[in-house]
Design a protein with these regions (language model features):
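Charged, gly/pro-rich active-site loop segments
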Residues: 1-12, 85-167
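Short secondary-structure boundary/capping segments
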Residues: 18-19, 44, 64, 125-127
Length: 167
């Protein structure tokens, strides 16, 4: 899992990075379309030894974009009542295929799906039939972090200072 020495320096930013990268959150992956515009996709992810793994289908736009141009960025944030933490990095994507991709994808799915979900033919079966590659995002270090828990002295995270985000 998280290779802390590889990804960050100690302190509040490191703690935030560990919290967000090891949590069960959604990530936004940005890749570049052929015309130069940006394509964003919300994805499940798994941090592995400083990289971000994303299970997907080779037929998706994000996969086709990564095959043509490996430059990408990832944004992961938490959104709770009175709390916002996030991390972001730019980097590049390597596409993993075959048996290695199938094994990596199982680890990504198991972060988000229960054993029951993985065994259900309409859930686990469907996702296995669809996701045939893994996007291996290698961030350019360092990650950027932010959070209402500590930025600006934590003032934005104090009760009564801001409205709660809609669920």
């Amino acid at each position: 899992m998280l290779n802390q020495h590889k990804v960050f320096s100690a302190g509040v930013h490191g703690e935030r990075l560990v919290h967000v990268l090891s949590g069960r959150y959604l990530a936004t992956l940005a890749t570049r379309n052929g015309d130069g515009s940006i394509h964003q996709a919300v994805v499940w992810f798994l941090e592995s030894d400083g990289a971000i793994l994303i299970a997907t289908s080779a037929a998706t736009r994000k996969a086709q974009n990564a095959a043509r141009d490996p430059a990408a960025s990832v944004l992961i944030d938490t959104r709770g009542s009175g709390e916002l933490r996030g991390v972001a990095a730019s980097g590049s994507i390597e596409i993993v295929r075959g048996d290695e991709a199938r094994a990596l994808n199982e680890t990504v799915w198991s972060k988000y799906l229960t054993d029951q979900g993985l065994e259900d033919p309409e859930v686990g079966g469907a996702i296995r039939a669809n996701d045939d590659i893994t996007l291996h995002f290698c961030p350019d270090l360092p990650w950027r972090t932010w959070g209402t828990d500590s930025d600006f002295g934590g003032a934005f995270g104090r009760p009564g200072t801001s409205y709660a985000l809609d669920a």
